[in-house]
Amino acid sequence: AAIDVDDVIATFDYYAELAEGLDAQQDSNVPLPSEDFSARLRREPCGVVGLIVPWNFPMVTTAWKLAPALAAGCCVVLKPSEVTPLPELELAAIIAESGLPNGVFNLVCGTGLAVGAPLSADPRIAKISFTGSNAVGVQVMQRAAETVKGVSLELGGKSSLLVLADADLDLAVELACGGAFFNAGQMCSATSRVLVAEELEEEFLA
């Protein structure tokens, strides 16, 4: 838990600093090859974004989505997993004390059917970001397509570990075990398969 808390703090610190840098660049001149034209750089928020986060690393994944959205100037509707809403409820209390204007951050708890699906299809949402299973990701994309909104998906993957013939075998075994069993294997980047050079197979499995 301490690692997660440190990660969350570092994420918000990073994007807070980035936001200040973006403000300094607003309306800056863009060099062009011709003096007959001029251009200025202006970044604008895309609008209200919907963030749907998973249960396995709830607060960390929330920080990865929420901090950049706020840094970009977007208002946010956050839907935590119905299994693990408590970290986000605590975050909402912290945000309420921070002085963030009302309505910039909004937390809606509930199931995917009750909250996630309507959020994905709502025309007032300009962008939806979802982390979770492939099956639900398909549904999010389909509902978002109804209003042609921006979509970011991070879905369950197949993270292979390649052990080549010249690998440090002790390190390879350590990484394979750590990758497969860290957090009980309940994460999208868990080592779901190991591809080992044929000549190392027996020694690797021993």
Please report, for each region that a protein language model flagged, where it lies by residue.
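Active-site pre-lysine segment of PLP-dependent enzymes
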Residues: E88-E97, G112-D122, A135-E146, L162-D166
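General beta-strand structural signal in soluble alpha/beta enzymes
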Residues: L78, L107-C109, F130-G132, V151-L155
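A structured beta-alpha segment of the ubiquitous adenosine-cofactor-binding alpha/beta core
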Residues: S38-A39, L107-S129
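PLP-dependent aminotransferase-like
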Residues: G21, T62-G116
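Residue-level signal for inorganic ion chemistry
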Residues: F12, G73, F105, I128, ...
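N-terminal Rossmann NAD(P)-binding subdomain characteristic of aldehyde/semialdehyde dehydrogenases
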Residues: A1-L66, L100, F105
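ALDH superfamily catalytic-core signature
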Residues: K127, A135-A206
